[in-house]
Amino acid sequence: MRPVVADPASDAVFWPEGFTLAGINCGIKPTSKDLMLMLCDEPASTASVFTTNLCCAAPVELSKAALSASGGKMRAVICNSGNANAATGAAGMQNARLMAESTAQAFDLNAGEVLVASTGVIGQQLPVEKIAGAMPSLKATSGSTQWCDAAEAIMTTDTFPKAFGVDVKLSGGTARIAGIAKGSGMICPNMATMLAFLGTDATIEPALLQELLAAANAVSFNAITVDGDTSTNDMAAIMASGKGPEVLRGSDNARLFGEALRSVMTMLAQLIIVDGEGATKFVELRVTGAKSNEEARMAAMTVANSPLVKTAIHGEDANWGRIIAAAGRSGASFVQEELSVYFDDEPILKPGLDANFSEERAKEVMSKEEFTITLSLGKGAGRATVWTCDLSHGYIEINGSYRS
């Protein structure tokens, strides 16, 4: 199902208690918002996942260390856009520390309680003095409902801010989970995300929160791809303010909370695909009949990342050969004569390499903004679902001049 962009004024958006947010321009970008704060009233149980890229950015290294040293208790996230502070050496690490320190000083925190994130151009030193100088404005404009301002401040090539939240009824009351995310290109996470910051007012221990975040991440942000590139700065973090009902390991509350967290993260992930650089189509790719779920995921991500598949999607060409060729190099086990391919409910390839399909009906499916490709490997019960988009001329236009 194609996700719908959340209206920040709508009752469909639920903001959890115990958080203050802000999004302003600090001067890294000429005019648009480029500095975001998410602050919890009290030390919050915090969990995070980070990029696995070996060229990880200074703020990723700093935030990993801070979260570990804190025992999973943090107070704030500070994030700038327009500059990644990646591949910047010792000076970049010092600038990341200064981001944390200036935030801590402005909001009466310890620097070790601040997660730091950055996104933008790689290899340029961060003008951290602009961030430090903007702290009074950040503080003056902060509030409990400024989630969409915060979402706007972390955008780079995004065309709209991404924010979403839900209520979840638990034993002991109702908890809220909300999040913001950014991402449009360089999207192919690997045990991490792009940038996503979530908050909940549930009461939950850091270790359990980390487990639930990792599980939700595996089927949301780790199940999307725009271009096959894993960023140097990917990070997803969630803070729990403890203002709401308690979530204990092994309880019904833990199951319900985990499902709600997964729904929020899935919506944010799908919004990233909708906003993929130059994208005109949103495609759900399902792989069934694999030997295992892991093999299904291998096949799904390989097909979803294939430039030939993605350009065929853009051109509305039912080139099933590209799909099975991509699956064939994925490492998943199958016999090609047992494969089948469907576009929505329309059979394109049947077992026995029977490709006697209706070009007209296939074109009708592919002309839609949203459709599903199902690839069955015919080997077992393993399955996986990922989301991707087409690859258009617009992607080249955006990325051919990103630094200019």
UniProtKB/Swiss-Prot annotation:
It catalyses: N(2)-acetyl-L-ornithine + L-glutamate = N-acetyl-L-glutamate + L-ornithine; L-glutamate + acetyl-CoA = N-acetyl-L-glutamate + CoA + H(+). It is found in: Cytoplasm. The record marks 192-193 as: Cleavage. One of its GO terms (biological process) is L-arginine biosynthetic process. It comes from the Bacteria. Its EC number is 2.3.1.35, 2.3.1.1. GO terms for molecular function: glutamate N-acetyltransferase activity; L-glutamate N-acetyltransferase activity. Belongs to the ArgJ family. HAMAP family: ArgJ. Catalyzes two activities which are involved in the cyclic version of arginine biosynthesis: the synthesis of N-acetylglutamate from glutamate and acetyl-CoA as the acetyl donor, and of ornithine by transacetylation between N(2)-acetylornithine and glutamate. This is Arginine biosynthesis bifunctional protein ArgJ. The gene is argJ.
